[in-house]
Design a protein with these regions (language model features):
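Extended ligand-binding clefts on enzyme/binding-domain cores
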Residues: 208-221
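An often Trp-containing, charged/polar helix-loop segment at the C-terminal end
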Residues: 195, 240-245, 294-349, 369
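Short acidic, Gly/Pro-enriched loop/turn segments at secondary-structure junctions
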Residues: 197-204
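Detector for glycine-centered tight turns/loop "hinges" at secondary-structure junctions
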Residues: 201, 272-274, 331, 346
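Substrate-binding/charge-relay-adjacent region of secreted/lumenal peptidase catalytic domains
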Residues: 1-193, 222-223, 227-279, 284, ...
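Walker A/P-loop NTP-binding active-site region of P-loop NTPases
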Residues: 290
Length: 369
């Protein structure tokens, strides 16, 4: 997550228009959001919805491990960003926010609680949290959390995860390139970031990288690269090589992207103050809101489900990702000494297949589920 210091900014509803989301308000859907700090503040959401001109959605907060749901510890920026992005696009959807502790068991319980919630029954989950997979995570923790994400995929629940905001370095600073987990899990839709302007009514977009790509230096960049933990899934037939010497042929992230630059950020209200925030942690809930709209249009009993593999399937010689996303071909996420990754024609490790063309994605999904 990164704060914008200047305009332009967008309401999430405006981005839904830029990205040609199918019409709708998310009625009948529940979007789950997983948080590990901060809190939900109804007055902020009410004020946001007044600015955005949308109805105030119903929000449920669920505490796990006695985690507070209304704490002001700095992470409320993240919580309110996630909720407000979804609210702007799907004001008639229910939003369920699961608060837990940032521990291995806390992660597992939060994902399990959302995926197996028989009362709220979310069809899509948004996660804006993570850390470099080969830094503070243990192998056991990654594998255990990944099993919970696998359960989500098997149950047809789409999990959208932010790919990180510090470029190829991922905030580690050891000279090597890193991937964020759980974005690197093969069972999630990993969401990267772009920098978006609208000129003469048309989007102009490139890979998100502000400054040197590191938040500690006042910049930021989309996370993305090649996993050192997860082998490349059979369904991910792409030609991307790790910049780390001797690395495995791992899972490549992100799968897709959306606006994330702090300088072209998302309008939010936090602690009573209106402003703009960016980061892939805004792009992930935007994709979750898109999926909620798509789910609302599908026949009863059908939903998007495990989306990532579908994007790599070929239909009439082109992948669904290529036909359902607008390709981003400029920019890079280089922030590590070893290097990073560049956008190119087709799939790449900075914006994946690109940003959504929502109506085309909805049509493609309808033909597959």
């Amino acid at each position: 997550m990164a704060r914008a210091t200047a305009r332009p900014w967008f309401y999430s509803s405006e981005l839904a228009s830029v990205y040609d989301f199918p019409p709708g308000d998310g009625a009948g859907q529940t979007v789950a959001i997983i948080e590990f700090g901060g809190g939900y503040f109804p007055n902020d959401l009410k004020q946001f919805c007044q600015y955005a001109g949308v109805a105030v959605p119903k929000v449920d907060t669920i505490s796990l491990h006695n985690a507070p749901t209304n704490k002001k510890d700095g992470a409320e920026d993240e919580v309110m960003l996630d909720i407000e992005v979804v609210a702007g696009v799907c004001p008639k959807a229910k939003i369920a926010v699961y608060f837990s502790k940032f521990t291995e068991q806390g992660w597992i319980d939060a994902i399990d609680a959302a995926v197996h919630d028989a009362v709220r029954q979310p069809s899509v989950v948004s996660i804006s949290w993570g850390w470099a997979e080969d830094d503070s995570w243990s192998t056991g923790a990654i594998d255990a959390i990944n099993e919970s994400l696998k359960d989500a995929a098997l149950l047809g629940v789409t999990v959208c995860v932010a790919s990180g905001d510090d470029g190829s370095d991922d905030g580690i600073g050891d000279g090597h390139a890193h991937c964020d987990f759980p974005a690197s899990s093969p069972y999630v839709l990993a969401v990267g970031g772009t920098s978006l302007r609208v000129e003469n009514g048309k989007p102009v977009e490139k890979t998100w990288k502000d400054g040197d790509g590191l938040r500690k230096d006042g910049g930021g960049a989309t996370g993305g690269g090649v996993s050192t933990h997860f082998a490349r899934p059979q369904w991910q037939k792409v030609s991307v090589k790790s910049v780390n010497p001797g690395s495995i042929q791992g899972r490549v992230i992100p799968d897709v992207a959306a606006d994330a630059s702090a300088s072209t950020g998302y309008f939010t209200v936090v602690d009573g103050q209106a402003g703009a925030i960016g980061g892939t942690s805004a792009a992930a809930p935007l994709w979750a809101a898109l999926i909620a709209r798509v789910n609302a249009k599908l026949p009863s009993g059908k939903r998007v489900g495990y989306l990532a593999p579908m994007l790599y399937q070929k239909v009439s010689k082109k992948t669904i990702g290529a036909t359902s996303c607008r390709d981003i071909t400029t920019g890079d996420n280089i922030s590590a000494a070893i290097g990073g990754y560049r956008a190119k024609k087709g799939f790449d490790a900075v914006t994946g297949w690109g940003v959504p063309i929502g109506s085309k994605l909805a049509a493609a999904i309808a033909g597959q589920v």
